[in-house]
A protein has these predicted regions:
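A compositional/biophysical signature of low hydrophobicity enriched in polar/charged and small residues
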Residues: 1-184
């Protein structure tokens, strides 16, 4: 269900998010022109969306290969069998502490999930294969990760054949597409 249909976002709010996902570098005046609303409306709406947490950050998608990164890795992990609330909270605290102290900056996503028997995913970028193996080695320090049961998918960022380059523009268009009515 689209956010607008759920009554969470107004049409102009959803369209503004879509425009920002396509290009967050545009001025409020340019966004107002694209949305066919006034510049103060865009400014007020953008500030509201920031305050309410709909807009977390403004960023760019660089050419990672030109920045010296060779690999993108998607690592599926399994948690250890003991998954009590206490163990999961301890795991979360260890992860947050490690992220704050050692700042493994190559990790762009580390989250719980499900599918194929796996319970989490790590998405990261690496300048070399040895950088990637160093991250995998650090994972052994996490007592809640079953390191004997991980699955890695590596993407060569220098590969000339790309079926769809990394972009949010397609998702920006998708959030404006009406969803099919569910059968009752």
């Amino acid at each position: 269900m689209r956010a607008k249909e759920a009554g969470i976002l107004k049409d102009v709010e959803l369209r503004l998010i879509s425009e920002l996902m396509k290009n967050s570098r545009r001025s409020d005046r340019e966004l107002a022109r694209a949305l066919k609303v006034s510049q103060p409306t865009v400014t007020r709406t953008r500030c509201k969306l920031e305050k309410e947490g709909y807009l977390k950050e403004y960023t760019v998608i660089p050419d990672f290969a030109k920045l010296g990164f060779q690999l993108a890795s998607f690592i599926l992990i399994k948690g250890t069998k003991s998954r009590s609330a206490e163990v999961m909270e301890k795991a979360r605290q260890i992860t947050l502490k490690d992220m704050a102290e050692r700042a493994p900056n190559e990790i762009v996503l580390f989250n719980r999930g499900m599918g194929g028997g796996y319970t989490g995913v790590i998405v990261s970028f690496h300048k070399s294969y040895s950088d990637y193996t160093e991250l995998v080695g650090r994972m052994k320090q996490y007592p809640f990760v079953d390191t004997s049961a991980t699955l890695s998918f590596l993407v060569d960022l220098n590969d000339r054949i790309q079926y769809r380059p990394f972009t949010f523009s397609t998702l920006a268009k998708h959030i404006l597409t009406p969803q099919k009515q569910e059968k009752k």
